[in-house]
């Protein structure tokens, strides 16, 4: 009887191990970085140079500076997912 319980316990443990979700690839993982917004308290003006960044909110911002403005205005923790458009 003890052997049978041991086999059942091992089978259940194996099912739990096999059933774990494993990321398919590192590409699917999203890494973000904090924008540099310290200068925004001194002068909140952004240049008109188009240097887009993709925010964690899924919005493409014209520049990192514009993303900083959105962070301040909306009081949200928007970070940069990647340089370029979303």
Swiss-Prot record:
Ion transport found in the keyword field: no
Keyword Disulfide bond: yes
SMART domains assigned to the protein according to its UniProt record, in alphabetical order: KAZAL
Site keyed Reactive bond homolog: positions: 48-49
Keyword annotations: Disulfide bond, Secreted, Signal
Single GO cellular component term: extracellular region
GO MF terms held by the record: serine-type endopeptidase inhibitor activity
Disulphide-bridged cysteine pairs: 37-68, 46-65, 54-86
Record's subcellular location: Secreted
A matching Pfam family: Kazal_1
Signal sequence coordinates: 1-26
UniProt tissue specificity: Synthesized in duodenal goblet cells and in monocytes in bone marrow and blood.
Ranges for domain Kazal-like: 31-86
Chain's role: Inhibits the glucose-induced insulin secretion from perfused pancreas; also plays a role in the immune system. Does not inhibit trypsin.
Record-linked PANTHER family: SERINE PROTEASE INHIBITOR KAZAL-TYPE 4, SERINE-TYPE ENDOPEPTIDASE INHIBITOR
Protein name per its UniProtKB record: Serine protease inhibitor Kazal-type 4
Organism: Sus scrofa
Gene: SPINK4
């Amino acid at each position: 009887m003890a052997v049978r319980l041991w086999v059942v316990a091992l089978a259940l443990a194996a099912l739990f191990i096999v059933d774990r979700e494993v990321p398919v690839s590192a590409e699917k993982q999203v890494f973000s970085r904090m924008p540099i917004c310290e200068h925004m308290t001194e002068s909140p003006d952004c240049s008109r140079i188009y240097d887009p960044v993709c925010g964690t909110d899924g919005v493409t911002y014209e520049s990192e500076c514009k993303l900083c403005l959105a962070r301040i205005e909306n009081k949200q923790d928007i970070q940069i997912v990647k340089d370029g458009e979303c």
